[in-house]
């Protein structure tokens, strides 16, 4: 069982901060043997700019820097020391889960066309839900597994090319 994060508080500090990577492919500056989890509000993937937050009892929560929950303007003064520098390790795992939201003009075979794009881009789909609004739009939420932000950008671009799709976004700060 891994321990929660423990800050190095020795009297003498090395000139270079300690860099320890986690099993999730995250390097946490100044912390060793640290539990790392990805924030569900913004679901970061390799290539995203990220920041860490030392939680109470759950290790370091990794957020995208553009996540509203990680916005420096919204940070509480008493939590200042709990925001830490984190980065992606060069050797990351195969798939990272994130969410895409698609808004499209509803039409026959829309889901099939979206599924075709996901298959063609070799994108893992772990969950997909869709609903139609009263004004004829389709709102589709897709949980996908991607290797990095480059693959995610490709998937987004290809989905935006599907007939009737108005926008494809990545939610942040749920």
Language-model-derived ranges and their functions:
Residues 16-36, 40-55, 64:
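Segments forming glycine/polar-rich beta-alpha architectures that bind adenosine-containing cofactors
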Residues 10-13:
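Flexible, glycine-rich loop/tail regions that form catalytic "lids" or insertion modules at the edges
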Residues 28, 40, 55-60, 100-104, ...:
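Hydrophobic alpha-helical scaffolding
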Residues 24-27, 34, 46, 58, ...:
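Helical mechanochemical/support elements of P-loop NTPase systems and associated helical scaffolds
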Residues 43-99:
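C-terminal, non-catalytic macromolecule-binding modules
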Residues 80-174:
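A conserved regulatory-domain signal marking ACT and ACT-like small-molecule sensing domains
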Residues 15-19, 23-29, 61-68, 90-94, ...:
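Generic detector of short, locally flexible boundary/turn motifs and exposed helical patches
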Residues 1-6:
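Short, small-residue-biased leader/transition segments that mark boundaries at the very start
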